[in-house]
Amino acid sequence: MTEPIIEFKDFSFKYNSQAEPTLKNINLKINKGEKILLAGPSGSGKSTIGRCLNGLIPNIDQGEVKGKCLVNGKDITSTSLFDFSFTTSTILQDADSQFIGLTVGEDIAFALENDCQPKDKMHQTVNQWANELKIKELLTQSPQSLSGGQKQIVALAGVLVDESPILLFDEPLANLDPASGLKTMAIIDKIQKELNATVIIIEHRVEEVLSQLIDRIILVNEGTIVADQPTNQLLHSNTLEKIGVREPLYLKALTAADVNLSSIKEVDQISTLPVSEKISDKLAAWTKQAKITKKEVDNLPLLKLDHVGHQYSKNQPYPLKDVSTTINQGDFISIVGQNGAGKTTLCRTICGFISNEGKITLKDQNLSDLSIKERAEKIGYVMQDPNQMISQKMIFDEIALGLRLRNVDEETIKQKVDQTLKICGLYPFRHWPISALSFGQKKRVTIAAILVLEPEIIILDEPTAGQDWKTYTEIMSFLKHLNTMGKTIIIITHDMHLMLEYTSRSLAFAKGKLIADTTPIELLTNQALIKEASLKRTSLYDLAKHYNLPDPNKFVQAYINFEQQNWKDEDYE
């Protein structure tokens, strides 16, 4: 019998800063060469399991260990971080925290330098992975100057050059555009096969991970393993959404159309679904009876961009250039496109964080006449990296800070902060220190700190990246509620389903230029725009094509309307 490369035996772990154990009586075996998806809600213990696999527990994170955890045959309690470095390579959720080199090229080469590789061999390997990941043009740039998605790709390259027997990916898709996400999964799959490496992927985006075959899905909830099954077996259950993890969209659509999934053997990919006239007829009938409604909009101009641009440096490959559009009162807009296309740069110019070419006006007032503070009273901005926004030690104080700076009375502050904490799923942690939170939980705190101020326009940079399905739904439902009240919401996102379900208008960017201003459905059914902006077709569209439905666009719209009609009418008053 093959010895497992990873084994947990009655393993529990309690951080010194916590009263209760984060992991409780874990029993798990992972064999050499397996590719595993580790999923679960935020705070479930997924990342803690990962920190056991790379030696951060117990070498860095101190706490109480019970039972055993063996990695490559060695007990983690008696293995140094140095020894772990030869066994487990990790891509962290926060890419900034693992950069070493002054340039992208130096950072990718760091592991090779430590392995004393010859200089010509290092250049060859770095160029190989830079070409594979399409980051050759970034090799001379500083990692800190890159967009969030570009940083994640560079971190991926830095891990892949080392060819360790265990590859641990903590939310590898969180900041990647859809096309890059699919490319990343294909690369991980290729490397795993070539090296027979053991791959563990910690990720909320289950559907994207399943674009490549996965051996097993392990679900963690409240510190325990609630499922450990082959992919198809797990997808036939309802365990994913029961614990707050989003199920693949095409499976939800099949279920909505009353298709019996238990009669289908392989459901992990659309291409493996049986082409059946019975299923096609059910989907077509469901589409035909669907009620499709369109929201009437008054289109009152609010924010106008006139030939707006910005260039960080002369060496920047694709500076933001000549963007002209009008944002209307009550719009719910998604800004999408390839990593480094200028999405975040545009929003920073709107907020006044960086200078801009051209003219930006809000209700006919030139924003260049306002200070950043004055702009902030009208335009709220939630950054992609929560660590760049947080300034207080306690969660409640961080969310209350903006209200206190505006001299709001403490009774009103408590009422507003408590309401926002509940909406963002943070109320149980209201007395916690920020330092005890996961990266995803910190992100929720920064969103709450802006939402509580109720500005006219709210701009959110990847608000749902790294969030579980329950939190995703709570945040987006709240934003939708604000939008129905007349708030204008702008979201930078790589989530195509978010764009379809929640936003009514999409701005697509590629290489610093605005290439499309249209509806989400029209954008995601235009193959030329999909390719140029590094997007991907929704699995709803692919499902409709797989079953030869006469109007795939109508099927997509029918399902989006179906989900919207099933939203709960939450009381936010």
Swiss-Prot record:
One family name in Pfam for this protein: ABC_tran
Family annotation (InterPro entries): AAA+_ATPase (IPR003593), ABC_Co_transporter (IPR022216), ABC_transporter-like_ATP-bd (IPR003439), ABC_transporter-like_CS (IPR017871), ABC_transpr_CbiO/EcfA_su (IPR015856), ECF_ABC_transporter_ATP-bd (IPR050095), P-loop_NTPase (IPR027417)
GO MF terms held by the record: ATP binding; ATP hydrolysis activity; ATPase-coupled transmembrane transporter activity
PANTHER family hit by this protein: ABC TRANSPORTER ATP-BINDING PROTEIN BC_2655-RELATED (PTHR43553:SF26), HEAVY METAL TRANSPORTER (PTHR43553)
Lineage, uppermost ranks: Bacteria, Bacillati, Bacillota, Bacilli, Lactobacillales
Job description of the protein: Probably part of an ABC transporter complex. Responsible for energy coupling to the transport system.
Residues the entry annotates as binding ATP 2: 337-344
Keywords of this entry: ATP-binding, Cell membrane, Membrane, Nucleotide-binding, Repeat, Translocase, Transport
Family statement: Belongs to the ABC transporter superfamily.
Bilayer disposition of the protein: Peripheral membrane protein
Record EC number: 7.-.-.-
GO cellular component: ATP-binding cassette (ABC) transporter complex
Residue ranges of every copy of the ABC transporter domain listed in the record: 6-247, 303-536
NCBIfam families membership: PRK13648.1 (NF010167)
Protein name: Putative ABC transporter ATP-binding protein LJ_1704
